[in-house]
Curated annotation (Swiss-Prot):
This is 5-oxoprolinase subunit A. Its EC number is 3.5.2.9. It holds the Pfam family LamB_YcsF. GO terms for molecular function: 5-oxoprolinase (ATP-hydrolyzing) activity; ATP binding.
Length: 250
């Protein structure tokens, strides 16, 4: 049994280099919600040194809201914005001896793509035109998974052990009760259940089936790094191997 562990990096949380010792895939911010050229270069260099798969973490151009404000943009704008961010990170990766292996949208772009086919198709088109061998990390069971596979791309289905789920498989919005789980023992139990049983309990008590191929470890917060170490240790104790997912392993 195996799983991919990913983390969002280059966002100013300060623990990027240490997190890269724990994860198999890194989603690197491309400057539109956080980060910048130097942060991107640092994260890419560390990822190459540690053998971690490099991924782009594009977003809406919204640093004021950390990319978490929903936007209604033309598909052409979304396509161009994603392609622009991929190009920036790709240039840095090439200079450091690496390459982009996957793309995981950030924040509102990620959440809207899960339910809005126009946005999902625009992201997928940008990834396909950039490099059709690049995988797309998407919320499990979401429209972005479907769009990626329809375009012939590898879709890697992502789950969140520390986020609340609705019965339809969507994440509870961050501002609503039950959105974020802070009981570490509960999160560890959910993590193992997602991998072994391929399901998660929603906030209303219903069980949601999902295909857990990669799990996001959040790096923001005072105890995030220590908790990430607990999760990695629990997986090791359970005999679950950690490997980069999908096309990211190529």
């Amino acid at each position: 049994m195996e799983i991919d562990l990913n983390a969002d990096l280059g966002e100013g949380c300060g623990s990027d280099e240490a997190l890269l010792d724990l994860v198999s895939s890194a989603n690197i911010a491309c400057g539109w919600h956080a980060g910048g050229a130097n942060a991107m270069r640092d994260c890419v260099r560390w990822a190459v040194q540690k053998g971690v798969s490099i991924g782009a973490h594009p977003s809406f151009n919204d640093p004021e809201n950390f990319g978490r404000k929903e936007m209604d943009l033309p598909a052409s704008d979304i396509y161009a914005g994603v392609l622009y961010q991929l190009g920036a990170l790709s240039a840095i990766a090439q200079a450091e001896g690496g390459r982009i292996a996957h793309v995981k949208p950030h924040g509102a772009l990620y959440n809207q793509a899960a339910r809005d086919s126009k946005i999902a198709d625009a992201i997928v088109s940008a990834v396909h035109d950039f490099d059709p061998s690049v995988a797309v990390f998407a919320l499990a069971n979401s429209g972005l998974v479907t769009a990626a596979r329809n375009a012939g791309l590898v879709a890697v289905e992502e789950v969140f052990a520390d986020r609340g789920y609705r019965a339809d498989g969507s994440l509870v919005p961050r501002k609503e009760p039950g959105a974020l789980l802070d009981d570490e023992d509960e999160v560890l139990t959910r993590t193992l259940a997602m991998i072994r049983e391929q399901r998660v309990q929603a906030v209303d008590g219903q069980w949601v089936s999902l295909n857990a191929q990669t799990i996001c470890l959040h790096g923001d917060g005072p105890h995030a790094l220590a908790f990430a170490r607990r999760i990695r240790g629990a997986l090791q104790d359970a005999g679950i191997e950690v490997h980069a997912a999908g096309a990211a392993r190529a």
